[in-house]
C-alpha cells in the first residue's frame, strides 16, 4: 500500500492543485488566519476597490470543516482525479480549459443580481461531478452503502442530499448547468455537427507547455470498458481532434 505522500504525488496536476488550494483555504479560515468574507466574490469590492483576488479565491472555499466540506473534497479526489486520469488522459490542457470555462461561466452567472453566490467552490465541484457522470454514465455508485445507482444520476442525487441536509440548492444546480453546457459544446455538438466551438485555445496549450504541467497529447481517448450502454447513458466514444 502506498503512503499518503506517494498517493498525493501520484495525483494529476490540475485536480491536485485545486484540491490542495481548497483544503488550505478552509484550514486557514478554520485557524482564523483568513476570514471567509475576505475570499468571497463581491463584485462592488472587485470593481470599486480593485480587490481582484476575489475572482479567484471564491473558488477555493468549500465551507468550514464539516461533513459537506469532506464530501466536496472527496469528490475532487475521486471524480476529478478519475476524470483527469481517464477521459482527459494526456490532455492536461483540455482539462485546464474545462476548469477555466467553468470558472468564467460561474463568474458570469454570479454577476446576475438575484443569484447572489459569493463562494463558487461548490458549483465548481458540482460541474466536475456532472462532467464525470457523463463520461462514465454506467458506473455503479453506492451512496453511503445504502443505495446503488448509475453514476449518470449521481449529480442529481447529491443535489437532493443538499436539500435534505439544509444546504442551498442553487450552487449545485448552477454547477450542473455549467457542466452540461461544457459537455454539450465540447462533446455532443461536435459529434453531431463536426464543429467544435469550445476548442482549447492555443494560449492554454502554451501555459501547460511553458510550465510543464501534465501531458499534452491530443490522441483520441477510448471509452472505459465499464461504460457499455446505449442512448442517453452512453459516454462519448471519441473526441474530435482538438
Swiss-Prot record:
<dbReference type="InterPro" id="IPR035952">
    <property type="entry name" value="Rhomboid-like_sf"/>
</dbReference>
<dbReference type="GO" id="GO:0005047">
    <property type="term" value="F:signal recognition particle binding"/>
</dbReference>
<feature type="transmembrane region" description="Helical; Name=3">
    <location>
        <begin position="95"/>
        <end position="115"/>
    </location>
</feature>
<feature type="topological domain" description="Cytoplasmic">
    <location>
        <begin position="77"/>
        <end position="94"/>
    </location>
</feature>
<keyword id="KW-0256">Endoplasmic reticulum</keyword>
<comment type="function">
    <text>May be involved in the degradation process of specific misfolded endoplasmic reticulum (ER) luminal proteins.</text>
</comment>
<keyword id="KW-1133">Transmembrane helix</keyword>
<dbReference type="GO" id="GO:0030968">
    <property type="term" value="P:endoplasmic reticulum unfolded protein response"/>
</dbReference>
<feature type="topological domain" description="Lumenal">
    <location>
        <begin position="116"/>
        <end position="157"/>
    </location>
</feature>
<feature type="topological domain" description="Cytoplasmic">
    <location>
        <begin position="179"/>
        <end position="242"/>
    </location>
</feature>
<feature type="topological domain" description="Cytoplasmic">
    <location>
        <begin position="1"/>
        <end position="20"/>
    </location>
</feature>
<feature type="transmembrane region" description="Helical; Name=4">
    <location>
        <begin position="158"/>
        <end position="178"/>
    </location>
</feature>
<protein>
    <recommendedName>
        <fullName>Derlin-1</fullName>
    </recommendedName>
</protein>
<feature type="topological domain" description="Lumenal">
    <location>
        <begin position="42"/>
        <end position="55"/>
    </location>
</feature>
<keyword id="KW-0812">Transmembrane</keyword>
<dbReference type="Pfam" id="PF04511">
    <property type="entry name" value="DER1"/>
</dbReference>
<dbReference type="InterPro" id="IPR007599">
    <property type="entry name" value="DER1"/>
</dbReference>
<dbReference type="GO" id="GO:0005789">
    <property type="term" value="C:endoplasmic reticulum membrane"/>
</dbReference>
<comment type="similarity">
    <text>Belongs to the derlin family.</text>
</comment>
<feature type="transmembrane region" description="Helical; Name=1">
    <location>
        <begin position="21"/>
        <end position="41"/>
    </location>
</feature>
<keyword id="KW-0472">Membrane</keyword>
<dbReference type="GO" id="GO:0036503">
    <property type="term" value="P:ERAD pathway"/>
</dbReference>
<feature type="transmembrane region" description="Helical; Name=2">
    <location>
        <begin position="56"/>
        <end position="76"/>
    </location>
</feature>
Amino acid at each position: 500500500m502506498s503512503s499518503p505522500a506517494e498517493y498525493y504525488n501520484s495525483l494529476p496536476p490540475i485536480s491536485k492543485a485545486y484540491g490542495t488550494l481548497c483544503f488550505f483555504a478552509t484550514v486557514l479560515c478554520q485557524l482564523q488566519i483568513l476570514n471567509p468574507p475576505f475570499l468571497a466574490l463581491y463584485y462592488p469590492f472587485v470593481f470599486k476597490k480593485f480587490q481582484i483576488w476575489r475572482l479567484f479565491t471564491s473558488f477555493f472555499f468549500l465551507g468550514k470543516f464539516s461533513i459537506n466540506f469532506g464530501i466536496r473534497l472527496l469528490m475532487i479526489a475521486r471524480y476529478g482525479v478519475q476524470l483527469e486520469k481517464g477521459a482527459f488522459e494526456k490532455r492536461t490542457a483540455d482539462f485546464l480549459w474545462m476548469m477555466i470555462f467553468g470558472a468564467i461561466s460561474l463568474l458570469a452567472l454570479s454577476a446576475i443580481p438575484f443569484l447572489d453566490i459569493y463562494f463558487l467552490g461548490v458549483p465548481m465541484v458540482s460541474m466536475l461531478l456532472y462532467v464525470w457522470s457523463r463520461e462514465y454514465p454506467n458506473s455503479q455508485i453506492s451512496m453511503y452503502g445504502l443505495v446503488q445507482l448509475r453514476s449518470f444520476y449521481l449529480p442529481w442525487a447529491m443535489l437532493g442530499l443538499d436539500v435534505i441536509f439544509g444546504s442551498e440548492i442553487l450552487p449545485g444546480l448552477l454547477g450542473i448547468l455549467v457542466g452540461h453546457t461544457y459537455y454539450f459544446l465540447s462533446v455532443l455538438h461536435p459529434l453531431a455537427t463536426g464543429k467544435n466551438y469550445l476548442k482549447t485555445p492555443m494560449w492554454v496549450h502554451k501555459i501547460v507547455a511553458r510550465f510543464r504541467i501534465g501531458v499534452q497529447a491530443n490522441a483520441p481517448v477510448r471509452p472505459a470498458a465499464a461504460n457499455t450502454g446505449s442512448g442517453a447513458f452512453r459516454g462519448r466514444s471519441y473526441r474530435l481532434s482538438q
